[in-house]
Structure formats: C-alpha cells, structure tokens
C-alpha cells in the first residue's frame, strides 16, 4: 500500500491525495466501473477540469453544489471536484420529481 505523508494539516484532503498519487503511481487504477478503468492520472485530470469549471461559475469554499445524476464514475468525479474546492456536494435522488425535487433544491440552497 502506498502511504501518503502530508507536511501540513491544510494539505490533508482527498484532492491533494489524488494529485500526489497521480504523480507517484499515475497509471495505476483508481476506479473500475463496469468495463471502464480510470487511472489516478486520468481521475486527477478530470477532477481538475471539473473543479476549474465550477470555480469559473463561482463555486467556492462552503458553498453547495447540487446535482441529480445516475450512478456512475462521473458522479465520483463531480463530488471530488466539489471537495477539491472545499464546496459541499449535494446529490439529489434521480427519482425526485415535482414538489419533492423543488423542496430538496430549496432546502439545500445550492450555489450551482
């Protein structure tokens, strides 16, 4: 098992850990989903791209990102991107419709 060492408590977050692993063992698998394989480097790249896009839309530390998506690797990438920014990810059940969906969005008060 590859151990990570963080010099500073501020660096101890999943985004930093993935970046460090991408540097150290980049092509090793991070995620296997169905027939797809995602390496640490690929996940790091995707998470960074999503985080940059979310930041460009104004998502910052402590704000909420609501999303309603079917299960899959993309959900993981989006959640990790929110975490990388220090934002809170709010997954919404894809079965919610009408009042349930409206109430969930209203109560979660997402930035995006």
Question: Where in this protein do the model-derived segments appear?
Answer:
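Short, contiguous pre-domain boundary segments
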Residues: 1-4
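Conserved AMP-binding/adenylate-forming core of the ANL superfamily
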Residues: 6-10, 27-80, 97-102, 106
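Hydrophobic alpha-helical segments typical of transmembrane helices
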Residues: 13, 17-18, 100
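Flexible acidic/glycine-rich loop/turn elements at helix↔coil and beta-strand↔loop transitions
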Residues: 20-26
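Structured binding elements
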Residues: 86
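Short beta->alpha connector loops at strand-helix junctions that form conserved
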Residues: 92-93
């Amino acid at each position: 098992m590859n151990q990570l060492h963080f010099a500073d408590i501020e660096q101890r977050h999943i985004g930093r850990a993935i970046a460090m692993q991408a540097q150290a063992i980049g092509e090793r698998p991070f995620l296997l989903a169905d027939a797809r394989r995602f390496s640490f480097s690929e996940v790091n790249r995707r998470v960074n791209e999503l985080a940059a896009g979310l930041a460009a839309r104004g998502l910052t530390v402590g704000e909420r990102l609501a999303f309603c998506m079917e299960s899959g690797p993309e959900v993981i990438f989006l959640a990790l991107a929110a975490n990388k920014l220090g934002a809170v990810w709010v997954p919404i059940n894809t079965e919610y419709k009408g009042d349930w969906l409206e109430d969930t969005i209203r109560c979660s008060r997402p930035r995006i």
